[in-house]
């Protein structure tokens, strides 16, 4: 027979094992969803859940009589004839006249020659013209003064030449810009570009293309990103994020080691939008501390503790990130009782985001006042709710982690209320880094630290161009055509007029409407 203490101990053990089993079951569900489920974080209304905010829906009366229906005659959807014209207005047009051959222009009744009486429009086609390449051979003209020559003082002058984008190569501004655009915008790896060039009749190896990218980035793009870095530090509101990247041939590290690409962005209302990528071999907090040296202001991030090393900043944490924790806490069966608490957490976040949408067109001061009026009460209820359920949540469960994540970082989640220019989320930074994560799926790794640094510079230029509303390919081509020959090493101020918000750059590289 068991003693009372042994029975009590066994009961406690059973309770502990049940909790562990529940946590493990939840983990298996979560990982299975990660592998095979949809990646969208959109959530539908959960049957039976307590919705704190949809008062109209919860107070409605299903038994109320429906309004009488009125029959509407069938109709055909109206064609919007202007849409096609607007779509094709900036594309060159050719006209094809379909007429009768000379020997067919006769009347079948009497044999008299036919005369054209006009033409009618039939249709429009969009024709695709494959890419083509051409070779440009540069010759330099030399000029001589015949008079000086006769006097024994020969004078010869040679015409100026455009500087090459890559010395001692056949690379042109358009070629290097195209290779970069394909790799860093369209996420097309160099080995696939190699095949494309071969189909055009050019045997251009991926090694050559890689060298062109690194040299062009080193000579023309990195100096510009350094100037952007100086501008970034002067801002008052920044966003930051980081993502893993595998880099080969790092000194003293295995090729399987994980490195990081950090991205720093100005806030949505900045007059000089900047997106800067920074490759570092680690995720240490020393990385943002060094990069953001001199910055004082609001820093939007997730809850990663490494950002705590950045001195003199007020951290604004991301509510989208917190919402993601509650979404991940939803069980597979969203109609189960276990779904109620995560759903309430999601509802709180959704309500905050709904309120934010109403504040987009307000001034910063108006936005701050409105947030304190409408969002702060929601936040107070949220923190009260989170604290009330914290003790009842299994610490290792998804819901327990979500609640703990929120409560431990309450101050950071509330800081966006301090200034109307602050954002409720770090979506801006996540959107900036997304092209890199998409590209990483295709090219998998960087071949060397130099290659990773070049990639960071190219991504910085491309994403900053997008943020400033200009075409990335046009901007790259513009830089490679204009910067060679500019003495910016001796006069760094010369680079100012090549920044993407400069009126000259804007007019030269603007996107087609």
Specify the residue positions occupied by each region the protein language model found:
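Short, flexible loop/hinge motifs at secondary-structure junctions
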Residues: 1-170, 210, 239-240, 301, ...
């Amino acid at each position: 027979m068991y003693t009372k203490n042994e029975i009590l101990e066994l009961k406690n053990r059973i309770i502990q094992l049940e909790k562990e089993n529940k946590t493990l079951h939840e983990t298996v569900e979560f990982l299975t969803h990660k592998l095979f489920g949809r990646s969208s974080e959109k959530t539908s209304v959960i049957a039976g859940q307590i919705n704190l905010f949809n008062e109209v829906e919860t107070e409605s009366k299903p038994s109320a009589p429906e309004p009488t229906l009125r029959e509407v005659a069938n109709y055909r959807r109206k064609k919007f004839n202007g849409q096609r014209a607007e779509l094709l207005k900036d594309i060159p047009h050719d006209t094809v006249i379909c007429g009768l051959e000379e020997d067919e222009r006769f009347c079948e009744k009497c044999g008299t020659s036919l005369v054209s009486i006009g033409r009618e429009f039939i249709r429009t086609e969009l024709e695709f013209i494959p890419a083509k390449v051409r070779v440009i051979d540069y010759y330099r003209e030399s000029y001589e003064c015949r008079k000086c020559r006769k006097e024994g003082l020969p004078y010869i002058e040679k015409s100026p030449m455009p500087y090459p984008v890559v010395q001692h190569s056949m690379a042109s501004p358009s070629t290097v810009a195209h290779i970069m655009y394909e790799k860093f915008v369209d996420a097309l790896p160099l080995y696939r570009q190699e095949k494309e060039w071969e189909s055009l009749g050019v045997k251009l190896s991926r090694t050559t293309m890689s060298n062109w990218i690194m040299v062009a980035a080193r000579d023309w793009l990195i100096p510009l990103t350094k100037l952007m870095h100086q501008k970034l530090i002067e801002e008052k509101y920044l966003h930051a994020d980081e993502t893993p990247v595998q880099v080969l041939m790092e000194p003293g590290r295995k090729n399987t080691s994980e490195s990081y690409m950090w991205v720093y962005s100005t806030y949505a209302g900045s007059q000089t939008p900047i997106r800067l990528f920074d490759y570092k071999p680690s995720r240490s907090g020393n990385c943002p501390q060094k990069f953001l040296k001199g910055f004082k202001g609001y820093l939007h991030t997730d809850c990663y503790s490494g950002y705590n090393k950045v001195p003199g900043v007020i951290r604004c944490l991301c509510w989208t990130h917190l919402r993601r924790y509650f979404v991940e806490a939803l069980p597979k069966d969203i109609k189960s009782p276990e779904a109620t608490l995560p759903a309430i957490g999601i509802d709180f976040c959704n309500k905050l985001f709904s309120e934010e949408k109403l504040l987009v067109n307000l001034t910063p001061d108006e936005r701050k006042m409105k947030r304190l009026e409408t969002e702060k009460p929601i936040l107070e209820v949220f923190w009260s709710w989170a604290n009330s359920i914290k003790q009842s949540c299994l610490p290792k469960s998804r819901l327990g982690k979500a609640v703990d994540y929120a409560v431990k970082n309450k101050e950071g989640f509330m800081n966006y209320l301090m200034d109307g220019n602050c954002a409720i989320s770090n979506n801006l930074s996540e959107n900036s880094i997304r092209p890199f994560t998409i590209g990483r799926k295709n090219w998998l790794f960087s071949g060397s630290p130099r290659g990773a640094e070049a990639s960071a510079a190219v991504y910085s230029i491309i994403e900053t161009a997008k943020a400033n509303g200009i075409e990335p390919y046009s901007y790259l081509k513009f830089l490679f055509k204009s910067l060679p020959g500019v003495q910016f090493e001796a006069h760094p101020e010369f680079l100012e007029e090549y920044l993407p918000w400069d009126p000259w750059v804007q007019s030269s590289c603007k996107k087609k409407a």
